[in-house]
Amino acid sequence: MGIKPSYIKNFGLELIGRYGDRFTPDFDENKHQVSELTVIDSKRVRNRIAGFITRKVNTKKHL
């Protein structure tokens, strides 16, 4: 999807820093976690943050 905006990255990294153990390599599960942990009205922004977190978790797993 291209380069993510900085607010998506910053918010995603903050969530990973605070609640890193709650996120999994599964996008749908992360989507529900982001909904639980935040108050984001926009489905598109929520999905972008969940996608960023999923990508980070999957990358971390391969290292």
From Swiss-Prot:
Domain of life: Archaea
Annotated coiled-coil segments of the chain: none
Alphabetic keyword roster: Ribonucleoprotein, Ribosomal protein
GO molecular function: structural constituent of ribosome
Pfam family, one: Ribosomal_S17e
Keyword presence, Transcription: no
Keyword Iron: no
UniProt GO cellular component terms: cytosol; ribonucleoprotein complex; ribosome
InterPro entries: Ribosomal_eS17, Ribosomal_eS17_CS, Ribosomal_eS17_sf
Biological process according to GO: translation
Database matches in SUPFAM superfamilies: Rps17e-like (SSF116820)
Annotated signal peptide: none
Similarity section: Belongs to the eukaryotic ribosomal protein eS17 family.
PANTHER family in alphabetical order: 40S RIBOSOMAL PROTEIN S17
Annotated NCBIfam families: PRK01151.1 (NF002242)
Protein name, as recorded: Small ribosomal subunit protein eS17
Organismal lineage: Archaea, Methanobacteriati, Methanobacteriota, Stenosarchaea group, Methanomicrobia
